[in-house]
Amino acid sequence: MTHALCACCVALLAAPSACGCDGIPGSDAGRDSGSVVPMGAPSAQALLDEVAGCAGVEIKGGFGLDGAGSVSMFACGSAVYWNADMDVDCDGIPTPPCDTDPAGQPQTSIVDLAPMGDVDPTLLPYFVIPLGTPESPWYATHGIELGQVGAVIYDGQVHYGIFADEAGGWFIGEASYAMCQLFLGPPTGGSDPCSPIDGGIDPSAITYVTFTGAPNRATGNEIYDHARHVEIGVDAANAWLAER
């Protein structure tokens, strides 16, 4: 699907930040922005402690992992959380190495909301929520929409991203190539830990926390702006921790 660039960014393509269009699809804008979390951001342990101490209400169960096991999603105040693995999602603009993904799709679910065209999975950290069967946006009744900001927690690290893609069926635990790279780093010695074919992170090692409600959602040109996602996510995470 082809979308026209916003008029501002056509004129300022060489300096997209001048019109609030950081992270233009196909550019290198924002590639490393998620690796720097601002001062005052909650730690990974603080978020995990909140998950552990919350009497979460199950909102959807029966999701599967690549390996054995069943996963449920829980609501806790202004957040929804789940534990899963991280398979690498390469849907969206097919730039290398995502153009080699045999399961890759030419667009993400957020494409129709993205004013400058689809997102690039090698540039934008995002995560995926499955639709179940029959497929439906069941998550909307729990304050989640495409563009919602969330925290992804693994190995003492927290990185923020948006909900940008849906998965058909019941398998859970996917995030973009860019999100995987924030945790595992770039290819080294000819080996890519985030290869869309056999990379990613082992089952159940990841905690995903999605912050609900309109204030915690990226819309319009914000969809491409990972620095903005971090800002929204840090504020939402601190507010969530203050609820109890």
Where are these regions (language model features)?
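Short, solvent-exposed secondary-structure boundary/capping segments
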Residues: 169-179
